[in-house]
Amino acid sequence: YGNFPTCSETGEDCSAMHCCRSMTCRNNICAD
């Protein structure tokens, strides 16, 4: 694993990237 400068926004896939801010990852989709 590496540290990537990008993150997933609301409604975006989070199976490969973590979610931005403090969102949660549900069913591989970021949710507020």
From Swiss-Prot:
Positions carrying 4-hydroxyproline: 5
Domain of life: Eukaryota
Zinc-finger recorded as keyword: no
Disulfide bonds: 7-20, 14-25, 19-30
Main location: secreted
Further comment: Authors confirmed the assignment of this toxin to the M superfamily by cDNA sequencing.
Protein name: Conotoxin pr6d
Natural source organism: Conus parius (Cone snail)
